[in-house]
Amino acid sequence: MQKLPFAVLAVWCLLTAACVQRVLESVPAHNLSQEVPEGYRAIYREIDAEIDRQLPLIPLPWGQKKTDTAFGVELLAANSNRGETLLSEQVVHATALTLDRLKALGVQSVSLSLQYPVMTRNHPQTAEYHEFYRGVAADIRKRGLMIVAEMGSAFREPELSRLEVDYRGLKRDKFGAALREMAEAVIADIRPDFLTILSEPDTQTRNTGLSFSPAEFAATVRQVVKDLDHPGVKLGAGAGSWVSIDYFKALAAIPELDYIDFHIYPVQYGFASDRVLKAAEAARAKGKRVAIGEAWLYKVLGRELTRISQVEAFGRDAFSFWQPLDENFIQLVVNLARTIDAEFCSFFWMKYLYAYIDYTTETSRLSPGQLMTLSDSAAAENILKGKLTPTGERFRGLIQR
């Protein structure tokens, strides 16, 4: 997500006959629950079949033994897309409580997303953001958790970001210079174990209006990391598993990077299995480590991927009937992380480890934005109580070392 992922899918895959045929021929792997509403049954069947098809592709080659992958979640309470809301005493206390719950859940790492221009000198409240994130980092360290920081740009949609920022007229070199300034501040204030400079080039294009070919994206990342002083902080960059592998190859060629980061959302077309395995192979060939910086199941049909809005897709996540698919997706990604020996693996929508919303006549009429807000409130209530969903319980069992 740094974000909340995600972007325009590579057109080539949607036009590839084999890929389209594979999705169209998908059949449900399990009996469909009557709880799944009629309007969502096609999506459910397609995703269920895709996960069932891909699980055997990740054969757990380590012989069932645990790996050193640091499993964790996005600390949504401290995501800078929340804007000025972060700068309140209430959020500080809520973040500390959330960290207590995550520690009890068994996570080993916590991810922080920071969007340009937060923590740059030109931002009017940069001092307040510096203070907030220094405090959050200290709270994370007190609990013995690893810190992953990821930089990027803010979403344009008000449902996804409250940062008031206008990227019109932004040039690529200015964006790179600002990210360099942010990186220096993040290293000084947060001192993360891992710092992902930039990911999801297609998302950055949609947010900023800047184009990013593989070469252009790699050049921007190189602008940030060249001669960057980063004692004790590993540097990385990445992309979504749905884009061309050329992005991963271009990033892997950057000498200053320690790791390549993958984001996983849609499962169609092998995006949660063989595509990641191939990208990991390309990274390893250049001596890079690998990581899964964001992952959550994207509830869309394969044919919707190039046209559905993120707001609509993320609104679908809220309903409780998705729970079995979320659990199976988590299993798939955990298996994948261990197979590629990922440094860390972070699941984005941590709120669904604590609460879903039931699909009712009333909730079926809510807009995607309203569903997202309602699910936030439900999760906050259950985090306060320390109550997990079955998805949260499954997650806890899967990530145990």
At which residue positions do the language-model features occur?
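Active-site cleft segment of glycoside hydrolase catalytic domains centered on the general acid/base Glu
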Residues: 120-132, 158-255, 269-278, 285, ...
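Bacterial N-terminal signal peptides
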Residues: 7-16
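Mature N-terminal, pre-catalytic/accessory segment of carbohydrate-active enzymes
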Residues: 19-85, 105
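Active-site mouth loops of central-metabolism enzymes
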Residues: 76-94, 165-174, 239, 313-326
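Substrate-binding cleft of secreted/luminal carbohydrate-active enzymes
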Residues: 30-33, 37, 291-401
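Glycoside hydrolase catalytic-domain groove-lining segments
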Residues: 98, 150, 232-235, 243, ...
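Hydrophobic faces of well-ordered beta-strands that scaffold small-molecule active sites
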Residues: 69-75, 110-112, 147-151, 193-197, ...
